[in-house]
Amino acid sequence: MTKQLETLLIGGAGKTGRRVETRLRARGVPVRVASRSAETRFDWADESTWEPALGEARAVYITFYPDLAVPWAAERVGKLARLATERGAERLVLLSGRGEHQVWPAERAVREAGAAFTIVRCAFFCQNFSEGALVDGILQGELAFPAGDVREPFVDAEDIADVVAAALTDERHAGRIYDLTGPRLMSFGDAVTEISRLSGRSVRYTPVSGEAYREMLAPFLPAEQASFLVELFGMLLDGHNSLLTDGVERALGRKPRDFSEYARDAASVWR
């Protein structure tokens, strides 16, 4: 059953959040976006912002910054989930990672908060190539990244947003955990070849070591953050996630979008 609840999107300016907002507004759902820079201010590092941001929200989409795998994520996510439930939230949807045992405590905290919950675990976003840290390398003609030849089932943020919007508005998704992937396994080299073909830009993929990637990040990120990213990518892209799931189809009743569909839509970014 579909039910329109006042909805809060934490991190609503991100890759999935802004797409979820578009879908909810199109359905007439009352929605607020909360982030460090939004009109509704929310900062994971400043608990004084949490209660005012929650307001009268009855459904909450939770995305954690910097990543749900960091050691302090579970404590903060759990505290926020319990506070939301105490204030009357009926539905919590958590964006999580696929194949990351570090995120399980945060997932458990949401499941045990007392509200209906949905956990959305995602593979590597397609949009990281066009809206994230990888786009600069593509525009420069070489994507250097520590992924070797591992094959990943890249998932489109459009599919993620469709699943999240459904979970926030339809009680049939309560209690579900969805593992979302795209419909095929591709190496990062395959992805770059597809991007090159559809955009007309000459791009090559160069696999690099974790240490080399850390050195590449050094001018742009604090050492601790760079080390965390290298460790995270090493964990996620070691091959254990090289399998497809039916999460999109289970949630939406349709097949997930293929990487080529995403790349065709995003091609103007790389031209």
Q: Which ranges hold each PLM region?
A:
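Periplasmic-binding protein-like
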Residues: 61-63
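Conserved Rossmann-like nucleotide-binding pocket used by diverse enzymes
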Residues: 40
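A hydrophobic C-terminal alpha-helical subdomain
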Residues: 13, 211-271
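Oxidoreductase cofactor-interface core, primarily capturing Rossmann-like NAD(P)-dependent enzymes
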Residues: 2-37, 45-48, 55-58, 67-71, ...
